[in-house]
């Protein structure tokens, strides 16, 4: 055909449309890609296989070493935290772990009842151990002991309170002072009751009434009795009065002797206590000087 100018038009090339040949080529490429990926996964390259095998061997060696160390210290509970997995970027693999196998491998009982049965000892064994050893050890409990600082603080406070408590008063009669006192045996005999125990000036205590001054008894006026009136009744009365007077004189002399010997012992004891107190005061003075020097050098206590 020719246009209005009389020239010829150039031939138009046909455009490639979605024909059957192009669609078949694209379908072949998409179908071959999964096959290649599958072959690569089934048969990986040699380098990656060697790296995986090295990582597995290293992991097995670490597990065997940890198992040997745990077998040695099985009685002390194996330190699970010391068992590490090497990580070098490529040989780290997450695997499925069974809890029962993990507990069995580390020597930990699976059930808590089994744990309590293993920890508690039989009664016969405990009694045998207590009789054999002087120090009795308490059986281990299944629960772990928790440290509580409040208990220690309360125990220290109670001990300090016990130390600060004033001691109970001491009976002076129970205190014995080492005094060099050796009285005359004759004086001891005169100070003792006839037929009784020997007088002990170290332990004898007088009542307050005994130490009070005795009242003066006025003597009765003498009555002159002629010889004609001195009958048996007179002489019996006279003998009774003489016996009573002798008894009172003996009791008074006995008490006087006892008081004298007791006073001599107390004087000796007093001098011994005074010397002891003087020595204690000297020692306290030395301690005070030491404390004052310490305070001047290091500050108050």
Curated annotation (Swiss-Prot):
Family matches, as CDD domains: bZIP_HLF
Residues covered by region (Leucine-zipper): 254-261
One GO process term, biological-process aspect: positive regulation of transcription by RNA polymerase II
Keywords from the UniProt entry: Activator, Biological rhythms, DNA-binding, Nucleus, Phosphoprotein, Transcription, Transcription regulation
Comp. bias intervals (Low complexity): 131-158
Tissue: Isoform Alpha and isoform Beta are expressed at high levels in lung, bladder, kidney, gut and brain.
Basic and acidic residues bias (residue ranges): 39-59
Region (Disordered), start-end ranges: 1-70, 130-174
GO annotations of cellular component type: nucleus
Compartments reported by the entry: Nucleus
Ranges for region Basic motif: 233-253
Record text on subunit structure and interactions: Binds DNA as a homodimer or a heterodimer. Can form a heterodimer with DBP.
Role: Transcription factor that binds to and transactivates the TSHB promoter. Binds to a minimal DNA-binding sequence 5'-[TC][AG][AG]TTA[TC][AG]-3'. Also activates the telokin promoter in smooth muscle-specific and calcium-dependent manner.
This protein's name: Thyrotroph embryonic factor
Organismal lineage: Eukaryota, Metazoa, Chordata, Craniata, Vertebrata
Gene name, Swiss-Prot/TrEMBL: Tef
